[in-house]
Swiss-Prot record:
InterPro entries: Casein_kinase_sb_PP28, HAP28. Belongs to the PDAP1 family. The modification Phosphotyrosine is found at Y70. GO terms for biological process: signal transduction. The gene is PDAP1. The modification Phosphothreonine is found at T18. This is 28 kDa heat- and acid-stable phosphoprotein. It comes from Homo sapiens. Residues 1-117, 151-181 are annotated as: Disordered. Residues 60-69 have a biased composition (Acidic residues). There is a cross-link at K52 (Glycyl lysine isopeptide (Lys-Gly) (interchain with G-Cter in SUMO2)). The keyword Protease does not apply.
Length: 181
């Protein structure tokens, strides 16, 4: 073990915050218990105890309704903060009769991006072949320059060949003339 013990690591529990609804429910439960204890201490006179018991039963019905509502409400910080995380939504199961097989299939983000990339590449190649892109225009201009240079070189070569032929012919004529003399 290194000097000074282990490093890092989270110690302690994550904090849990109680919502205002939860605090209210706890306070009401404590008050209810206090009332019940007081009623038990006072004694159970039959005539005097009946209205209190009826009131107590009504209160307990209301508290049960409140507890049901409380269970439906979100606990902790979830009640205070609206969370809209699509990954967190539990997907409901569907019956086979409810499935829509004819509807358009939704693609994932990666698949959509891949298809868009391929389509963009195809569009670019079409425009490139038509000579409408900057790169195609530059290529065509370069090819035109090269074509002109080759034509000029071929023309010069042809002129040099003709000049050479003329020189050889004129040289032969001179020789033949000089021989004839």
């Amino acid at each position: 073990m290194p000097k000074g013990g282990r490093k890092g690591g989270h110690k302690g529990r994550a904090r849990q915050y109680t919502s205002p609804e939860e605090i209210d429910a706890q306070l009401q439960a404590e008050k209810q218990k206090a009332r019940e204890e007081e009623e038990q201490k006072e004694g159970g006179d039959g005539a005097a105890g009946d209205p209190k018991k009826e009131k107590k039963s009504l209160d307990s019905d209301e508290s049960e309704d409140e507890e049901d509502d409380y269970q439906q409400k979100r606990k902790g910080v979830e009640g205070l903060i609206d969370i809209e995380n699509p990954n967190r939504v539990a997907q409901t199961t569907k019956k086979v009769t409810q499935l829509d097989l004819d509807g358009p299939k939704e693609l994932s983000r990666r698949e959509r991006e891949e298809i868009e990339k391929q389509k963009a590449k195809e569009r670019y190649m079409k425009m490139h072949l038509a000579g409408k892109t900057e790169q195609a225009k530059a290529d065509l201009a370069r090819l035109a320059i090269i074509r002109k240079q080759r034509e000029e070189a071929a023309r010069k070569k042809e002129e040099e060949r003709k000049a050479k032929d003329d020189a050889t012919l004129s040289g032969k004529r001179m020789q033949s003339l000089s021989l004839n003399k």
